[in-house]
Amino acid sequence: MTTRETIFLYTDGAASGNPGPGGYGVVLKCGDLRKELSGGFALTTNNRMEMLAVIKGLESLKWEGARVEVYSDSSYVVNTMTQGWKRKKNHDLWARMDSLCARFNVTFHWLKGHAGHPENERCDALAVAAYSRPDLPADEGYNTGESQELF
């Protein structure tokens, strides 16, 4: 693979309850190569999982400067990255995403979810399977608002 080849990154995030157990699913494609990633947390939100799907996909790439086409059904992610929506929450993940996007030539595309797109459907299945696993870890960046900052 060369940096001139386009990498297609399909993502989805899901949560059972919002907040609740959540998962992300990723499908990466480049030429004949394909890779799938997934993971989940015991208590999180769908938006955090949508963001984490993009982050985990970008973190898995080894070619600095590669052209990456991100396809997500999350208007939250796509419009924040392309239309400058205000970032009120999830600052930890936005910082990670910005840092990763700076390493690649990334373009974001919105794609209608649950509309029969094979890669999006696969990402959704991976996300749901991930949050259905027992003994999910804590999402350390998720703040339930129950704890107060002391300083």
PLM feature spans:
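RNase H catalytic domain
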Residues: T6-P21, I55-R122, L126, A130-Y131, ...
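Structural detector for hydrophobic anchor residues on beta-strands
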Residues: L9-T11, Y24, L37, M51
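Short beta-strand scaffold segments in enzyme catalytic cores
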Residues: G23-C30
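A short, polar/acidic, helix/strand-boundary loop motif
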Residues: G31-M49
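Short amphipathic alpha-helical face segments that pack within enzyme cores
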Residues: R48, L52-K56
